[in-house]
A protein has these predicted regions:
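Acidic/polar hotspots within intrinsically disordered regions
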Residues: 6, 775-776
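Short beta-strand elements
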Residues: 872-887
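Short amphipathic alpha-helical "recognition" segments used for binding
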Residues: 7-9, 18-20, 166, 223, ...
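Glycoside hydrolase catalytic-domain context in secreted enzymes
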Residues: 37-768, 772, 778-847, 854-856, ...
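Gram-negative bacterial Sec-dependent N-terminal signal peptides
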Residues: 1-35
Length: 887
């Protein structure tokens, strides 16, 4: 059976933890002064930044100093079979115990933004627990948008504390793959497109997780930048691109945060699976970086026993093989060990690493922390995190903030107005006690004094069945459609099950056999027309009776069939689809749920404020698929354009984890990007819209005007077989700068209700000199400090993210026009001036030299650029660097 839940943390243990917390701020780089200047951190949320430092862990059982001694004591007592049992799964999410030695089962959980609901011990089915709810935090894109190390700490601490309370040993996050492709289905899980930003934020995130006696698992190592054929696509970047762009966040996780675990990627790397790549694992990760933790696979990876064992894989996790002893790292490994094909010393190294992790997080320590979960403080933290990630993209004529005392009637529209997102996205889905929708947040904020009207614009094109009528519930309690995937066209061999928010499916060019089903309950009696728009073979069943016979559908033609439904009765609806394209199920009710164009435009003209909550959902942003394009789903562009024409002050509030095209952007006065905001999203959005929270987020990704402006598409380097990363080091904004392409909204862009002035840039020296670096030398032997004064020239308190970009003026290799090398978030009262400070190291000046296989900073001039975004540079200054070769 699954492990029991922890009860409430004891008062004695809590007192001990809180006492230890007093000194932890400095250890995590969060000073008391920084907290005092941070307006969104209150006494109620302060606890989440005060996590146990390493010196407190030493005090509790003197754990860290004993780890290696305990490993040396335990390892010789293990039999060969016991050692092998530890390097592969014994269930869907755990490796086994060796109870005679006090080695317990090590349990893992998905959850980069909330601990996932409990999975059955040996299958993918939900365990059906009633006490596995967790706090649903904003995903890491929102944390990246905060550009705030404190927010990464806050996020990591809540995640770690809740994982510990759920009795988990490893949390499978954070993710640090870069947003190379806007279509990538998992961009929302990661930290944006820039290697420096991701590397900077992942360190405090990991430290905070692990301070809770839980191991963080950084993923996916490496180059998992598309879901299209993700288990087979061959990533083939050149070495310089690999080192400068796609590895720095992993390197920081190892060297600066001492992360306990790393999860390998699904994809191949230069012809072999990334989990068994000698170059990635033994040479770089465990060799150059000195990683002491464990490398574990993702679930269902394509490896072989010998290469995986010899090239550094430590744990093979879940597959579809029924018998865990048949895993590649189980019986086949034992046979190779007995035959002498794999040395026992190789296995011993893996077991040492596993024991090191278990001992380091206190799995054999009676003083191990117990954590806490679903507390009011954690809900406050979720709201704080959501608020700090909101990005104000456009605010002409100061349309925002809205003034509550001037509002009598507010019109709310858009597919995300009352949608909840926590249950979707794939492995990152969270079972939360509740989730505040944007509509609910506005109603809670404005109360009964303001009339808030929700309207659903009808489209001139096809509309899916809305979830208002669903009685089927995802186990999180959210109205949802179940989707079953089959291996055969007779649809008898079930492959997997999942859930989607709407009855629409995109096979992304891969032949699929799916059954999309839910129970619906009409609210009126009469003729209901079921409509199917698809490319492929479709059939529709109502209560297991075929309403639309199996037929070949064409996307240009809608197949319709009407039947009489009775109000209050439940009907089982099943859409079966076979094909490699798309299918959507819609309907028309006797009195349509949707408002006509005439109705919603008339309401928009009269309203005191119009807010359109659009964007994406986890039907679009989710694991296992990429989007087909950057177009907003559901004809949103059409509706937004019409709203802006009749009411130019319409606020367009986008929710989603990846870039979308916005052809109406020039006509919009107010555009906001809110990401997926977690369980407190609606409250945080309302705070920002009504001026109770001054937006301070900045874009961690570039928002292109069109998909063809992006490097992978422009260079035809996005396909199912291989990606050579043709753009090289010119990822994201670097590509746009190099190609002189104007984006829709630039990397680092984000407005405030305040205004800020930059002045007085200063360098600690006009020139620096340095010697050759080794692979282990990050900082070099000298640094240069850059400072700049920032003044809040407005009458509104606010925060500004000051960004430092660097350029090697004359380099021997192509280098970006701007590379992010520093950022500093300043909280400024109205009229206040503060100084932003940055330290540049030799590594910051360097590129990866393929000739010497090392970092190289060339002599010459470097230009420092200080700005509010990559496209809004306010100050510039140059310095000289002199490289001195070692004698």
């Amino acid at each position: 059976m699954a492990k029991p839940q922890h009860g409430n943390i004891s008062s004695n243990h809590k007192k001990k933890a809180l006492t230890a917390c007093v000194s932890s701020l400095i250890c995590l780089g969060v000073s008391h002064a920084a907290l005092a200047a941070h307006p969104t951190i209150t006494p109620q949320t302060l606890h989440a930044l005060t996590v146990l430092p390493d010196n407190e862990k030493l005090r509790i059982g003197d754990r860290i100093s004993q780890v290696e001694d305990d490993i040396n004591r335990l390892l010789p007592q293990l039999t060969l079979k016991e050692k092998v049992s530890l390097v592969h799964a014994a269930g869907k999410f755990h490796i086994p115990a060796i109870e005679r030695l006090g080695i317990h089962e090590m349990w893992m959980s998905d959850g980069p933004h909330g601990v996932r609901y409990e999975i059955d011990r040996n299958s993918w089915a939900p365990a059906g627990w009633t006490n596995d709810y967790s706090t649903y935090l904003p995903p890491l894109t929102a944390i990246a948008a905060s550009w705030d190390l404190n927010m990464a700490t806050l996020h990591g601490n809540v995640l770690g504390a809740e994982a510990r309370h759920r009795n988990k040993d490893l949390i499978l996050g954070p993710g640090v793959n870069l947003a190379r492709l806007p279509l990538y289905g998992r961009n929302f899980e990661y930290m944006g497109e820039d290697p420096f930003l991701a590397a900077s934020l992942v360190v405090p995130e990991i430290k905070a997780i692990q301070a809770n006696d839980v191991g963080a698992t950084v993923k996916h190592y490496a180059l998992n930048t598309q879901e299209l054929n993700r288990t087979k696509v061959n990533a083939k970047p050149d070495e310089r691109t690999l080192r400068e762009v796609y590895l720095p966040a992993f390197e920081a996780a190892v060297k600066q945060a001492n992360v306990h675990a790393i999860m390998g990627a699904y994809n191949e790397f230069r012809g072999t699976n990334a989990n068994q790549s000698k170059h990635l694992v033994n040479t770089i990760l465990k060799g150059e970086w000195g990683f002491q933790g464990v490398l574990l696979t993702d679930w269902n990876v394509d490896i072989n026993t010998y290469d995986a064992a010899m090239n550094g894989l430590d744990i093979e996790m879940g597959t579809d093989v029924a018998d865990f002893d048949d895993y590649f790292m189980a019986k086949p490994l034992l046979e190779m060990l007995n035959a002498g094909k794999v040395p026992v010393s190789v296995l011993d190294d893996k077991v040492r690493r596993i024991l090191r992790v278990q001992l380091s997080i206190g799995m054999m320590d009676k003083h191990r922390l117990s954590g806490e979960r679903n507390t009011q403080a954690h809900r406050d933290d979720a709201r704080t995190l959501a608020a700090n990630g909101i990005v104000l993209l456009k605010n002409d004529n100061k349309v925002l903030p809205l003034h509550a005392d001037k509002l009598k009637h507010v019109l709310v529209l858009g597919p995300n107005a009352d949608k909840r997102h926590g249950f979707g996205g794939g492995s990152s889905e969270v079972k939360a006690l509740y989730e505040i929708s944007p509509l609910a947040g506005l109603k809670a904020k404005l109360g009964d004094k303001v009339d808030i009207q929700l309207m659903r614009p009808a489209s001139s094109q096809f509309m899916p069945i809305p979830n208002d009528y669903l009685t089927t519930r995802h186990w999180t309690g959210t109205p949802s459609w179940q989707i079953n995937y089959y291996n055969d066209n007779k649809m008898t061999q079930l492959a997997s099950e999942s859930w989607i928010a709407d009855p629409q499916f995109n096979a992304k060019g891969q032949k699929q056999f799916v059954d999309i089903k839910a129970n619906i309950k009409p609210i009126e009696t009469g003729s209901h027309s079921f409509n199917i728009k698809a490319d492929g073979q479709v059939a529709l069943y109502i209560n297991d009776t075929q309403l639309i016979a199996s037929t070949q559908a064409n996307q240009g033609h809608v197949i319709s069939k009407a039947m009489t439904l009775t109000a209050g009765e439940t009907y089982a609806v099943s859409l079966r689809y076979q094909g490699d394209k798309q299918a959507t199920l819609g309907w028309e009710t006797p009195n349509s749920l949707y408002n006509t164009e005439q109705e919603y435009l008339a309401a928009a003209k009269k309203a005191d404020a119009v807010i359109y909550f659009g964007g994406l959902s986890h039907a679009d942003d989710r694991e296992s698929i990429d989007r087909p394009d950057m177009v907003l789903p559901g004809q949103q562009d059409e509706v937004i354009a019409k709203l802006l024409k009749v009411n130019p002050n319409t606020v367009v509030f986008m929710i989603g984890g990846s870039a979308v095209e916005m052809p109406w952007a020039d006509n919009a006065k107010a555009v906001v990007w809110g990401w997926y905001g977690g369980m407190e999203a609606g409250n945080a959005y309302a705070d920002m819209l009504l001026g109770n929270q001054n937006p301070s987020g900045k874009m961690p990704i570039t928002l292109p005007k069109k998909l063809t402006d992006t490097a992978p598409i422009a260079l035809n380097d996005y396909n199912a077989t291989e990606s050579v990363y043709s753009e090289g080091v010119f990822i994201g904004y670097r590509w746009f700068e190099q190609q002189n392409i104007a984006p829709l909204f630039a990397f680092g862009h984000g407005l405030s209700y305040s205004q800020f002035d930059y002045s007085n840039i200063r360098l600690s020296s006009a020139d620096i000199a340095n010697n050759d670096m080794t692979n282990d030398d990050i900082a070099g032997n000298d640094t240069i400090t850059v400072t700049v004064d920032v003044t809040n020239t407005s009458k509104v308190d606010g925060a500004e993210v000051v960004q430092l970009y660097l350029h090697d003026v004359k380099a021997s290799v192509p280098r970006p026009a701007k590379e992010l090398k520093g950022f500093d978030k300043l909280w400024l009262k109205a009229g206040e001036t503060k100084t932003a400070s940055f330290t540049l190291t030799q590594r910051d000046l360097s590129f990866w030299d393929v000739n010497t296989n090392n970092w190289l900073a060339e002599s010459g001039q470097f230009e420092v650029m200080i700005g509010a975004s990559v496209a809004d540079i306010r100050l510039r200054k140059r310095f000289d660097y002199q490289h001195k070769a070692k004698p």
